Amino acid sequence: MDYFLKIDMGVPLVSIITVCFNSEKTIQKTIQSLLNQSVTGFEYILVDGKSKDSTIEIIKSFENKFKEKGISYKWISEKDTGIYNAFNKGINLSKGKWISFLGSDDIYLKTAIEM
């Protein structure tokens, strides 16, 4: 494992997983859409395939913002071994009762996580 960060804010109801690789053009809007959620009872997990662009720097730039909102934020960056392996890594890191996947080039609307 090359790098791993975990900011744990308790047991979440929902785990949201994003798998990414060289996603600097889209990942900021993806992550921001989770910060804009109307609820905070979730955790966000990003699994990066050792991006060669600025994806990791963008992911790092959100660490304190999630901490300030009390949202668990975890990310890992390891050599890419395939998308399904990356999804499994995210699932293994998750603690939520439910799991949802969000593409690195997609966003959630503000109320997407509301129950």
Task: Locate each region found by the language model.
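Nucleotide-sugar donor-binding/catalytic module of glycosyltransferases
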Residues: M1-M115
